[in-house]
Structures are given as C-alpha cells and as structure tokens.
Amino acid sequence: DVFRPGDPAGTLYYVISGSVSIIAEEDDDRELVLGYFGAGEFVGEMGLFIESDCREVILRTRSACELAEISYERLHQLFQGPLAPDASRLLYAIGSQISKRLLHTSRKASRLAFLDVSDRIVRTLHDLAGEPDSMSHPQGTQLRVSRQELARLVGCSREMAGRVLKKLQTDGVLHARGKTVV
C-alpha cells in the first residue's frame, strides 16, 4: 500500500505508469474499491483543496507502478513562483479528474442502492472492459479480475460474486475461469 487511513496527508501523487486502486476499508477489514486509476491521473489531490491531517482511504498498487509525488506545500510554492503561468491549467486538469470521479462515485452509489448484485456485477464488468488494462479477445474483451476483487468493486461477498459469475456463464453471457473473464 502506498498509503492507508491514518497516514499523514500532505502529498499529491501522479501515476506515470501502471495502475492503482483507491479502497475504503471498514473496521472489520471489509473493503470497497472506489476506483482504479492509471497513467496520467492524479491521486491524493483532496488535500490541495481541503485541509486534512490524515488519509481516509487506501491507495494500493494493482501492477508495477511508477508514481511521481510532490508535497502540497511545495506545489503551492511552485504555483506562486515558476508554475504560476501554468497553475490554472494544472488545477483545471485536476478539477476535471475530480469531476469524473464524482460522477463515477455517484453512479456507483446509485448501483449499490438500486441494483441487485447480478446487475451490479454485469455493469461493473462492462465498466472494466473500458479500462486500459482490459485486453481484446476473439470472443469479446478479456478482463483479469479475481472474484474477491469483483466483490470489493460491487459491495458483496466473494462467494456471491462467484455464484453470479457461474450463473452468467451458464446463461452464456460470459466465460469465467480463474481470474480471467471474457
């Protein structure tokens, strides 16, 4: 993990390569994946705009990653100095990413409230098919996702995710084997 709840907040990260996930964790160790982020995305940007002493979520690498980091304090100094001409463009890019995440989170909250587990899994698999680390396959799109990870994405148990995948496979909607879903 790059950071965990309770860790000091004071750094903005930029994903140069690889993929990371943001995860909310409950006291009983249950986890909900809030989102995946890849190359070209900022992570940990909240502290630029609201004061917070500590992190509230987990930032976990999903693959080999290269991350750039800069302290909020140093970035604010650069905005007042050498980066002043580019500050509005950079802040707009960060704001745009935050807006997309808010939209994604709103959709996820709606799904949790209004859809059953089966529909949440189908929609989540559809969303994952649009991610950069999905692969083209003769029968559609190949995803590499464990049942545990899928459960964390949709807010259900690993067993329930497995049952739904099995039913979807029986219905001919997809093919699942191990961590591979087509």
What are these regions (language model features)?
Residues 1-17:
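Regulatory nucleotide-sensing modules
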Residues 2, 19-24, 42, 66-67:
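Short beta-strand segments in beta-sandwich/barrel cores
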Residues 8, 111-118:
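Conserved phosphate/pyrophosphate-binding and hydrolysis machinery centered on Walker-type P-loop NTPases
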Residues 12, 34, 67-68, 142, ...:
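A residue-level structural signature of the nucleotidyltransferase/glycosyltransferase Rossmann-like core
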Residues 33-95, 103:
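Cyclic-nucleotide recognition modules
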Residues 96-99, 103, 122-130:
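Amphipathic, well-packed alpha-helical segments that form the structural scaffold of globular domains
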Residues 117, 124-182:
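Phosphate-/nucleic-acid-contacting segments
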